[in-house]
C-alpha cells in the first residue's frame, strides 16, 4: 500500500463549527469579523444565508456547517471572511463560525481519491485529525443557466 506523501508545513486557520474543528489554508483568509447585520433578500441560492457589508464589498454569507456536520449553526461567534478563485476572479465569502479561530503551522497530507470533494488535505493537531477545506467545493459559484430557465438579456 502506497503511503500518501507529506506536504511542507503550511499555515492554517482552525475554525469551529458546532462540536467539530476544520481548517482553511491561511492564505485564503481575509479577516475574522464580529457578527454583523446579515441582509436577506429573495434569491435562488439556498447555500447563501444573505450578505454582509465589509470594506465596501457585498460578501455572501454561506453556512457550510450543515454540509459538514449535518446541523445548521444556531450560534455565530464570528464570520471568517475567506477568499476563493472563481473564473479567474478572486471573491470573498463569509463563513459563520461558532467558536474561537486559531492560526497554526502543520504538515498537510493531501486528500485521497476516496475523500469527499470538500477535503483539500488533512492535518493533525493536538491528537486530532482535521479536514482542510476546499472552499470551491463547499460554497456556491456561478452556475450555467438551466435549460428552460429564463435568462436576463440587456
Where do the protein language model's features map onto the residues?
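An acidic, low-aromatic, low-complexity terminal/linker signal
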Residues: 1-154
Amino acid at each position: 500500500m502506497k503511503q500518501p506523501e507529506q506536504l511542507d508545513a503550511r499555515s492554517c486557520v482552525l475554525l469551529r463549527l458546532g462540536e467539530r474543528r476544520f481548517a482553511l489554508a491561511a492564505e485564503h483568509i481575509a479577516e475574522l469579523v464580529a457578527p454583523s447585520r446579515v441582509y436577506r433578500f429573495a434569491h435562488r441560492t439556498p447555500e447563501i444565508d444573505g450578505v454582509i457589508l465589509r470594506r465596501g464589498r457585498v460578501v455572501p454569507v454561506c453556512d457550510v456547517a450543515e454540509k459538514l456536520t449535518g446541523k445548521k449553526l444556531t450560534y455565530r461567534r464570528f464570520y471568517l471572511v475567506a477568499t476563493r478563485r472563481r473564473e479567474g476572479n478572486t471573491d470573498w465569502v463569509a463563513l459563520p463560525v461558532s467558536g474561537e479561530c486559531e492560526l497554526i503551522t502543520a504538515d498537510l497530507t493531501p486528500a485521497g481519491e476516496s475523500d469527499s470533494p470538500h477535503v483539500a488535505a488533512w492535518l493533525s493537531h493536538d491528537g486530532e485529525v482535521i479536514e482542510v477545506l476546499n472552499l470551491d467545493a463547499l460554497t456556491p459559484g456561478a452556475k450555467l443557466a438551466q435549460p428552460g430557465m429564463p435568462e436576463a438579456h440587456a
